[in-house]
Design a protein with these regions (language model features):
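Preference for long, amphipathic alpha-helical scaffolds in soluble/luminal domains
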Residues: 1-321
Length: 321
């Protein structure tokens, strides 16, 4: 994959500082947030998915930045795109640094740093915050009214796409905290709330894109997912954690997708006229890896690859044609 135009295009956009787009978390350009391009952490994770060599210069440069984000360094510059928010509202500082550390931890865990003491320390701290939430009554009633809106309880610290990705990529942490991992798996298997909600960040109300209050997969009665890339990403995380069996919607969607595989294991649904589209930007790093969708075979590649990877994570025997 490292020679692909897709990976080369990602590398080309990296600055000498090790960052991308002048920001950390941006999943797409956002003039309102001052984000001109996709940020450092999504692009770093995308390079990992594209199998760019870990010893390469892009990772060496970015690793320095990510490990610094895990530290207790209070340098305002490390807030990147959230710096303006915190400057105008200092109460938002704790939230900003927490989300940045979670995202950086996910990226470093996926990069193979699971046993690095710096990441282990951050990982256990993140896991402890989630564990405290899961054990509290707030986990069952996580919302409060805030004027006309529904807001997340101020004491709620639910898992996020970042923290779950980190935990999924840290097998020893999961073994050391087996009880927590099981509680988290059951929590992630329940349906996510349907109603939109906001979180209070300092004096502002923000619509969160990163939090997971249950299984986010939406599927019809036949098991077809509304957002196939998001469904596969979530199923893959649950499979890594050994929690897929507890998630009824996720298992139903996986079964439906597998039904569309032919005798050689290739995902080939009828009348596939276009590549499944990602509706949620959270899967930017994950999908698509194969951009050529001009042929039927090209449209099948990504989903086939993900289904094979999930099968491998589940311990299934794969026969390659």
């Amino acid at each position: 994959m490292c020679e692909s135009k897709t990976a080369a295009a990602v590398v080309k956009k990296q600055k000498d500082t090790g960052t991308w787009g002048g920001n950390l978390l941006g999943l797409a350009p956002s003039p309102a947030q001052g984000i001109k391009d996709v940020g450092t952490i999504p692009n770093y994770r995308r390079l990992l998915q594209l199998e760019w060599p870990r010893t390469g210069r892009p990772f060496k440069l970015a690793d320095r930045v990510l490990f610094r984000l895990l530290s207790r360094d209070e340098d305002p510059a490390l807030l990147f795109e959230l710096q303006k928010l915190v400057k105008s509202d200092p109460e938002a500082s704790i939230w900003a640094r927490e989300i940045i550390r979670e995202a950086a931890s996910a990226a470093l865990a996926e990069a193979g740093y699971a046993e690095d003491p710096r990441l282990r320390g951050a990982g256990h701290k993140i896991a402890s915050s989630i564990s405290q939430f899961l054990r509290s009554p707030v986990a069952d009633k996580p919302f409060v009214k805030s004027g006309k809106a529904i807001a997340l309880h101020p004491e709620a610290h639910p898992p996020s796409w970042y923290s779950v990705a980190m935990i999924a990529a840290m097998p020893n942490l999961r073994r050391e905290r087996a009880g927590f991992t099981e509680r988290l798996g059951h929590y992630l298997a329940q349906p996510a709330p349907k109603k939109p909600f906001v979180i209070q960040v300092g004096k502002r109300s923000i619509k969160p894109q990163h939090l997971l209050l249950g299984d986010p997969i939406e599927a019809d009665a036949k098991g077809y997912p509304k957002d196939t890339p998001l469904a596969l990403h979530y199923i893959e995380l649950l499979a890594q954690m050994g929690a897929l069996e507890w998630a009824p919607v996720a298992t139903r969607v996986l079964a439906r997708l597998l039904k569309d595989c032919d005798e050689t294991g290739v995902w080939s649904p009828k009348n596939l006229r276009s590549q499944p589209k990602a509706l949620n930007k959270i899967t930017y790093h994950y999908y698509p890896l194969h951009l050529d969708a001009n042929t039927t075979e090209g449209r099948e590649v990504d989903i086939t690859f993900r289904l094979a990877l999930i099968a491998k994570l589940l311990g299934w025997q794969l026969d390659y044609a």
